[in-house]
Structure formats: C-alpha cells, structure tokens
Amino acid sequence: MAVNQSHTESRRGALIPSGESVLKQCEDVDLCFLQKPVESYLFNGTKKGTLFLTSYRVVFVTSHLVNDPMLSFMMPFGLMSDCTIEQPIFAPNYIKGTIQAAPGGGWEGQAVFKLSFRKGGAIEFAQLMVKAASAAARGIPLGSVNYWFDTSGLYIITVPGAAVCSSQTPCPAYPIVIYGPPPPGYTVQPGEYGTPPEGYGAQPGGYGAPPMGYGAPPVGYGVPPGGYGVPPGGYGVPPGGYGAPPGGYGVPPGGYGAPPGGYGAPPAGYGAPPAGNEALPPAYEAPSAGNTAASHRSMTAQQETSLPTTSSS
C-alpha cells in the first residue's frame, strides 16, 4: 500500500501501472481509517474522492477540491485482508478491511480502512473486487477495453459512454492516465481501417459492369452458356438447376409426319378429335388398289340385294 503516489499532478486522475485495466470507477466515495498507524497524520479525518478498481489494486484519489494531506491511496490485493461489506440502515453501504504497508509506500504498519459509497454501488464494487483479486492470484488478471491512446503514448481512460479524451482535449471529470507502451495487440487507434483482409480483393474474372437495374451477380453463377441472350425485362438470373432441356425432347422421330391423304377436316358437327388419336394405328392404313375394286363390287351387290322388289299394280 502506498500514499500519495497514484495521482496526477492536477489531482484530477489516477496513475495506473502499464498493462493494468481499469475495471470500475465510482465517484463520491468517502475514505476514513477506523484504525490508524502510529505517528501518521495522513490518516486523520475523512477524505472525499473517486475510487478506481484495476486488475491488481484499488486506488483512491482525493478530490482536487478538498484540502487534505492524503492526495491518493493505493491498496494492492495482496496486501488487503479481512474485507467485508456492511449495509447499515441509516448510512451508505461501505467496505471495510485491513491493509498492510508496502516497502517504500510512504508509511509503516497496518490500518483498517472504511470506504463509504454515498451514491451506491458498494455491493457491485465488492463483488468485482473479489473476482479481480481471485483472477490476479491465478495469474489471469481481468481485462478491460475502456482505454484509449494517442501518439504520445499516454493512456486516458474515461467512464464508459463518455467522450474520447486526448492530450489536446482533456476530459473535464476524472480521466485515468496510464504511462507506458501500448498493451500488446493495440497498434492502431480505433476508427482507422487499413488493407482489407485476404479474400476481399478484386472482383473475380467474368463479371463486368452490371446493367442498369441489376445488382451484383450472385455467388455460383458464371457466364451463361451459348444460345442464351439478354433476359427479358422483369426476369432475373434463372435459378440453379434449370440448364439446357434434357435429351429426348428435340425434333419428333420419323413416322409422325403429316396424316395420309383422305383424312381432311371432319364434317360439320364434329369437334376436334380427342388427344392421342392424331395418327392412325398400323391396322388402319390406306387399302391397296386391288382391294379397292373388290370392295366397290361388294358394296354394289349389297345395295342391289337390299333394294325392294317392285310389284305390278
């Protein structure tokens, strides 16, 4: 734990070691010490300010409007113990615990701290602090992406949803400034887009400029085969599976030509012949010349025998 080593020169922000992430920020928090170290005036009274939770520690920054000798107070998870959350009826919820002094931290011994959340959020802060401490102990610290960096290498973290801050346009409230190189994997400021990834290059061959009213050709449709001209208006690209007509549906085979002579239009009163009776079956072909004469003599004899006989009066 260190005293007066974690605040900016203007006392409007917190100094966070490089590589750590700010997980939560709470304003209007009161800090007091129920048990103070011996011979240290820095721990007297109640301090008002902003509380920050990072991947490895808790940092309290006293408000720049308050005249107090303790400007900042930093507590690493490894030096905190006996932390509890209290919910009094007529007072804000608070977190209480014991903190040990760190070598070179500006004080010696131990103290019992009390963090009161006047605007609420004590339970959420305590729960996240327990998760962060457990993750840090396993060597897998919690991370956050709520930071920004500019060309100077200065990191400025703001409340989620706030405007982006920079060295030219500082935040009006409590930015958190992080000194050091950018974390691994962050080399370009968000909002700048470089070369598109592989696979998003030029349009493949075979696709020219689409005609008016036609969008980009869908994937899987190449150049149409020969014999297919420009599609008529209102018709797009034919769906898949409709290629050339299958074999067998071309010119009709021999034997189905024009009907034989003598079969012209039917007499009046007869409609069109039913479907399937267009061609004569093999047994109903035209008779030969000899059969025609014999048939004519037979018909004449039948007519003569069937005529009635005339009787004399």
From Swiss-Prot:
InterPro entries for the chain: GRAM, WBP2-like
GO biological process: egg activation; female pronucleus assembly; male pronucleus assembly; positive regulation of DNA-templated transcription
Compositional bias of kind Gly residues: 254-264
Keyword Repeat: yes
Tissues and organs where the protein is expressed, per its UniProt entry: Expressed in testis.
All residue ranges annotated as the GRAM domain in the record: 8-87
MF annotations from Gene Ontology: chromatin DNA binding; transcription coactivator activity; WW domain binding
Keyword field: Repeat
Record motif PPxY motif 1, residues: 183-186
Sequence repeats: 179-185, 193-199, 207-213, 214-220, 221-227, 228-234, 235-241, 242-248, 249-255, 256-262, 263-269, 270-276
A GO cellular-component term linked to this record: nucleus
Residue ranges, annotated region (Disordered): 254-313
Role noted for this protein: May play a role in meiotic resumption and pronuclear formation, mediated by a WW domain-signaling pathway during fertilization.
Protein name, per record: Postacrosomal sheath WW domain-binding protein
Organism: Bos taurus
Lineage, top ranks: Eukaryota, Metazoa, Chordata, Craniata, Vertebrata
Gene: WBP2NL
